[in-house]
């Protein structure tokens, strides 16, 4: 109705396109965002939303351009910066996979079969947590979680989370931790690896993360689902003497793991998982999403 009354109403075109996107009517949503931009050329949110749709349509180069335009008009646009960074890292990943294939051919090494890879059973190990690591995470920039579940974010409740570039932090303790975890990841998947995301969560009373996995359209487009994995490293499990002690719940098949301080769990990124926490003290974990290169 708003568009009928005012055809050049950019915000209305953006809002309608957002609804079409949620209904998975992606081509129509794309046209709607383009109309919004036509009537408001500096509309950062519309550029970002257009990039999201093009990402879903597997047109990553176009998405990249629109994330950059969103940042041009809104330099502090966190979501646009994150999505752009992911696409740039995906470009780097594809290059590394190709280089790895060439290297393996030169060495005449037979590719590891899927039967020898980490599959449905999680890989479990442990790493001693340094006190310095625990204290350093509180000093790194983080943001509050959404208070309610299903409000646009997987994580919810009382707590905080970092951005997705934790391993790029310059502190010696983070560098040492990332090196150790990368070696563990290589051991788990029997391959060199590429980290696409690294972050930390601090969960407090009445918090958690909804059922989800870590597959994205890029993985489907490049047939990388069987090469993507997720790691959780428990820095502090918090208060487990409560109704919801932070059990890691894995699905298909269902499995429950109650971690301890220092626990490391690695599983395929295709696998759905969730956790709920209601303890009195902070529950802190580092998360990593990564790919095997062969």
For each feature predicted by the language model, list its residue ranges.
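Conserved alpha-helical positions within TPR/SEL1-like repeat arrays
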Residues: 11-22, 45-55, 79-86
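Non-heme Fe(II)/2-oxoglutarate
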Residues: 97-191
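Catalytic core of non-heme Fe(II) oxygenases with the double-stranded beta-helix
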Residues: 190-277, 282-285, 289-293
């Amino acid at each position: 109705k708003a568009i009928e009354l005012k055809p050049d109403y950019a915000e209305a075109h953006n809002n309608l396109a957002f609804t079409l996107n949620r209904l998975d009517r992606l081509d129509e949503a794309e046209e709607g965002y383009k109309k919004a931009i036509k009537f408001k050329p500096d509309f950062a949110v519309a550029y970002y939303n257009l990039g999201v749709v093009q990402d879903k349509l597997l047109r990553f180069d176009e998405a990249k351009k629109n994330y950059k335009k969103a940042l041009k008009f809104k330099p502090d646009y966190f979501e646009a910066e994150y999505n752009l960074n992911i696409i740039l890292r995906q470009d780097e990943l594809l290059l590394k996979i190709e280089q790895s294939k060439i290297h393996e051919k030169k060495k005449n090494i037979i590719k590891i079969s899927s039967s020898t890879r980490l599959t449905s059973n999680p890989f479990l190990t442990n790493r001693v947590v340094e006190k310095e690591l625990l204290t350093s995470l509180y000093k790194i920039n983080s943001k509050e979680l959404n208070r309610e579940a299903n409000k646009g974010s997987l994580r919810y409740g009382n707590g905080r989370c970092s951005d997705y570039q934790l391993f790029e932090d310059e502190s010696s303790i983070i560098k040492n931790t990332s090196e150790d975890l990368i070696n563990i990841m290589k051991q788990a998947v029997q391959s060199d690896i590429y980290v696409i995301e690294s972050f930390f969560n601090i969960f407090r009373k009445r918090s958690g993360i909804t059922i989800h996995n870590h597959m994205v359209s890029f993985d489907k487009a490049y047939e990388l689902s069987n090469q993507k994995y997720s790691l959780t490293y428990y820095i502090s499990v918090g208060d487990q003497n409560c109704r919801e002690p932070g059990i890691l719940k894995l699905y298909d098949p269902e499995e429950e793991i109650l971690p301890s301080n220092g626990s490391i769990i690695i599983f395929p990124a295709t696998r759905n998982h969730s956790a709920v926490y209601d303890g009195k003290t902070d529950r802190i974990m580092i998360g990593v999403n990564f790919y095997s290169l062969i």
